[in-house]
Structure formats: C-alpha cells, structure tokens
Amino acid sequence: MAFEKLGEKFSNFFAMDNEDDYQDQEDEQAQQPAPEQPVDNHYRSNKVVSMATPAGKTAKIVVYEPRVYSDAKEIGSHLLNNRAVVINFDRIGSDDATRIVDFLTGTVFAINGEIKRVGESIFLVTPANFEIDGSLASTIDSDGLNLSSQH
C-alpha cells in the first residue's frame, strides 16, 4: 500500500495527463495584457548632422597651421562642427601638406563642402552651409597644388 501511494505520487509528478492545469496557466498568461512600453519615435543616428546655422548664432572660421599630418583629424572635426577653416601650410613639409589636402578633400566631399586654394600655401575649407564666391586665379599655379617651396 505504501508502495502504491509512492508509485502514484511519482506517476502524478511525471505524468502528462493533467493538461488542464497546463492550459489554465497558458490562458492566464494570454489574458494578461503586455506591459506598455513608451514608443520612442526619435531617430537615433549620429550620421545625420544639421548643417543649418541657428538664427542669431555666429558662424565661426578657424585659422590653423598644421605641423604634423595628424592635425588633419582636428581640422576635419572643425568641418564636422560646421566651422570653416583657413589652413596655412607654411610650417609643414610639402609631402605632409599634400596628404592633409588629400584627407580634407575626402572630408569635404563627404559633407558636401568645398576646398579652395586662396594663396601659395593657404587653403580655405568649408562645410556645406558656407558659400565660397570669387576667384584668385592669379595666385594659383596652373599645375594645382604646388608646395615645392616648402621646407
């Protein structure tokens, strides 16, 4: 008799014949509404940058004299923050100056900006919200970037 009760307990414990209990639990879960989570409709992307200057805010132009190639990253950061940069390459070698101009050419392409040579070793680099007007053809050599007079 004791073994029968023990066997009955094991069979009740491991048996799947109590499906009604299982369905009741499932029904209770289905009837409970899912907790509401606030919907965030804000677009989260760091790739989208507003290029418009807010009303009343002064646009900035940064003057920069790079001394090493790694300065190109800082100049690029100014462009991404909607600041125009005037770059004087007098204090850097022509190879590094050429590399910086190449880097900045790619940067201004990506942000729809412009890069213009305004002097023998001076460039103006602007983001999309600036407009460069005029020409300095008399100061620009026909062979493009000529920084051979550099150190």
Swiss-Prot record:
Q: Where is this region: Disordered?
A: 17-42
Highest taxon in the source lineage: Bacteria
| Annotated localization | Cytoplasm
A cellular component term from Gene Ontology for this protein is: cytoplasm
**Biased composition annotated in UniProt, kind: Acidic residues:** 17-29
Which Pfam families is this protein grouped with?
SepF
By its UniProt entry, which InterPro entries does this protein fall under? Cell_div_SepF, Cell_div_SepF/SepF-rel, SepF-like_sf
Keyword annotations of the record? Cell cycle, Cell division, Cytoplasm, Septation
Is the keyword Cytoplasm assigned to this protein?
yes
Q: Which GO terms describe its biological process?
A: division septum assembly; FtsZ-dependent cytokinesis
Q: What is its main location?
A: cytoplasm
Key word Cell cycle present: yes
Q: Which PANTHER family match?
A: CELL DIVISION PROTEIN SEPF
Fill in the subunit field for this protein: Homodimer. Interacts with FtsZ.
Its biological purpose is as follows: Cell division protein that is part of the divisome complex and is recruited early to the Z-ring. Probably stimulates Z-ring formation, perhaps through the cross-linking of FtsZ protofilaments. Its function overlaps with FtsA.
Q: Which family does it belong to?
A: Belongs to the SepF family.
Protein name, as recorded: Cell division protein SepF
Organism whose genome encodes this protein: Lacticaseibacillus paracasei (strain ATCC 334 / BCRC 17002 / CCUG 31169 / CIP 107868 / KCTC 3260 / NRRL B-441) (Lactobacillus paracasei)
What gene, per UniProt, encodes this protein? sepF
